[in-house]
Amino acid sequence: MTLLVRMSLAMVTLCLGVACSGPLQLANIQVGRALNQDRSISSITTLFKPNETIYVSVQTTAAGKGTVSVKWKYGTRVIDEPSKQVNYDGPASTEFHMQNSGGFPPGDYSVDVLIDGVQVGSRTFKVDRYFE
């Protein structure tokens, strides 16, 4: 086989692998105050102090590509809607975080998780100024 033929076959294989990656599928949603190196949550919790950074890790099951978005809410009011375009070769975690330099108001919060614009899950958490 000539070098040109081998390179062409390698390119076709690579292109098929990328084109055949399916949509992302949710495995788990974690909320907490710290991350591991793989972007999963190392300190899972649903109770935060007003000055803490709040992390959410969206874990997907297998290779896939798409848009992962979160909708952070305080009560029913949407406070942020970040999104990330991702393309993973296998199971992975996509991280989002929220912080407020002036501190979060105490109360009930939630984060909705969307994959390609479709809500796939939600988590609730609370900010409490008396939490030690």
Model-derived features: positions:
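Aromatic sugar-binding surface patches on proteins
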Residues: Y88-M98
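Short, exposed beta-strand-loop hairpins at the edges of beta-sheets
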Residues: S101-G103, S110-V127
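Sec-dependent bacterial lipoprotein signal peptides
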Residues: M1-C20
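Extracellular Ig-like/FN3 beta-sandwich strand-entry sites
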Residues: K65, P106-D108
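Conserved aromatic beta-strand anchor motif in extracellular beta-sandwich/beta-rich domains
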Residues: V70-Y74, V113
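Short edge beta-strand/loop segments characteristic of extracellular beta-sandwich folds
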Residues: T53-T61
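Solvent-exposed serine/threonine-rich low-complexity stretches and specific carbohydrate-binding patches
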Residues: I79-D89
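Short, compositionally biased P/S/T/A/G/V-rich stretches that sit at domain boundaries
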Residues: C20-P50, F131-E132
